[in-house]
Amino acid sequence: MVEELIALLIMASALGMDAFSIALGMGTLGLRFSQMFKVGLTIGVFHVIMPLMGMVAGKLLSAHLGLFANWLGAGLLLWLGLVMIVSPFQEKERTFVDPSGIGLFVFALSVSLDSLSAGLSLGMVGAKMALAVVAMGVMSTVLSWLGLFIGMRFQRYVGPYSELLGGFILCGFGVKLLLPY
């Protein structure tokens, strides 16, 4: 139980790094504290909903796919980690949506899509659902708030490195799923 909790907290931190790195940029926009609160909370809610949907789908798939489900889950985590590792080095201009109304909804959805894949992986390997989604929701909320606050002051120094770290952590979990086999 403790080992699973630690693993889920590390994975939740890795997934929250994407939200953290994007929140760093959004933190430079001069948002009010009430806006920052809403942004972090909305991202957290989406980081509960998306992995929950993924875990339900993963449990259904694992019942039919058996051992292959572990390999598929590991593959998804490795793919997601590699995308996060490569992403900071791609030349692209990040555009920020207005962090209110539908813009906030679209922003939170886009930041939490990786949690859907992670949830699918966790569902396939039989992780504890409530523990996983609460860990992901809380961690992404806290990391988003942290990113927004740090972004107000230090965005140019931290930038893409947090996403890079998150990618390496997810790849590590993907490899861990493959090791027993």
Curated annotation (Swiss-Prot):
Pfam families: Mntp. It is a multi-pass membrane protein. Belongs to the MntP (TC 9.B.29) family. The gene is mntP. Probably functions as a manganese efflux pump. HAMAP family: MntP_pump. It comes from Halalkalibacterium halodurans (strain ATCC BAA-125 / DSM 18197 / FERM 7344 / JCM 9153 / C-125). Keywords: Cell membrane, Ion transport, Manganese, Membrane, Transmembrane, Transmembrane helix, Transport. It comes from the Bacteria. InterPro entries: Mntp/YtaF (IPR003810), Put_MntP (IPR022929). GO terms for cellular component: plasma membrane. GO terms for molecular function: manganese ion transmembrane transporter activity. PANTHER family: MANGANESE EFFLUX PUMP MNTP-RELATED. It is found in: Cell membrane. This is Putative manganese efflux pump MntP. The chain crosses the membrane at residues 5-25, 36-56, 66-86, 102-122, 130-150, 158-178. The keyword Translocase does not apply.
